[in-house]
From Swiss-Prot:
This is Arginine biosynthesis bifunctional protein ArgJ. Catalyzes two activities which are involved in the cyclic version of arginine biosynthesis: the synthesis of N-acetylglutamate from glutamate and acetyl-CoA as the acetyl donor, and of ornithine by transacetylation between N(2)-acetylornithine and glutamate. GO terms for cellular component: cytoplasm. Transmembrane segments: none annotated. The keyword Disulfide bond does not apply. InterPro entries: Arg_biosynth_ArgJ (IPR002813), ArgJ-like_dom_sf (IPR016117), ArgJ_beta_C (IPR042195). Pathway: Amino-acid biosynthesis; L-arginine biosynthesis; L-ornithine and N-acetyl-L-glutamate from L-glutamate and N(2)-acetyl-L-ornithine (cyclic): step 1/1; Amino-acid biosynthesis; L-arginine biosynthesis; N(2)-acetyl-L-ornithine from L-glutamate: step 1/4.
Amino acid sequence: MNVKGFRFSAVEAAIKKPGRLDLALICSDAPAAVAAVYTTNKVKAAPVLLDMERTTSGTCRAVVVNSGNANACTGDRGMEDARETTSLVAERIGASEHEVLVCSTGVIGVPLPMERIRGGIPSLVAGLGSATLDQIAAAIMTTDTFPKLEARTGTAGGVGYTIAGIAKGAGMIMPNMATMLAFVVTDAAVDPQWLDRVFRRANDTSFNAITVDGDMSTNDTAIIMANGAAGNPVLSEGSEGAAEFAVLLEEVLLSLAKLIVKDGEGATKFVEVTVKGARSDADAKRAAMAVANSCLVKTAFFGQDANWGRIFAAVGYSGADVEPDRAELFFDDVRMVQGGVFAGGDAEARGTGVLRKKEFTVTVDLHLGDGRATVYTSDLSYDYVKINADYRT
């Protein structure tokens, strides 16, 4: 996939197991507008803290990413290692150190193997242009089972452009952000301040609307770079083509977010949870996330048990305003609850049939207002426990 003005590279630096790409570089030939969102965990990894400082400038040349080590909870050394990594890249691409961002993912509490990173960076930079975005997606994987890539094309002022994104993440996935990294590149010319706003809006309905296990990581980062190489008139609030760009960006991020859930550790189901008729959108999101994060609900999904009571209970303890005798609950189009009680008839059998599917929807209508939210989740299987019990061994 070609995105004008961007080059990619990935190498094996022996950070992960032998034979796996684990050091990647995304580089723009010219300074690019940049926006980013980060984990809300109060325990933030060194690369997150460094990037938070640097993205305030609104411009960026490159992002270097390692997988296999999170560089989190590593003290002063962790920050020194993050800075050195960006410095080594910057001097080889002819950029300021402050124009280079760094991301890490992997085991927490272990210092970066800097001798391996130092050894890998010369070939990483020399190989710019030799890798595809698919290979970068593979290089940033940890417990993922497949690389995640999505792209869209659009036009602005009669000029075509591309938006392409990659992501990783399969566990510790819950808003806001989670063990997930996402990188979006576009050759569209975009005003930096508007890019920041539109990127945050798109994140709210995508990466901040997914959960696999309710855990929040120390490293989560989503970055977008827009280098203007397409040559379109600069996109900004209300400009021609701005609305289309915003829609396409949201489509890319939502598709990546769904792929993360589908690749959830041990996941066998993909479930869309919608709460509507709430007092507010915030109430709806609160209730939907309570359902999507409930271990009892998720194990019922895995067991294909139409246990609507667990869902109803999760809505009740979510903190959202609920009047039980008004509520309805559906599995796909099968009404399981009406007026706060079991719908009766053949609902149990039909609901069980829905839960046998790989993908289905759960809809709760509170009948209290116009608030609405949708989140995406998976089931919780035996394999999730095994994957995470064995993670460091």
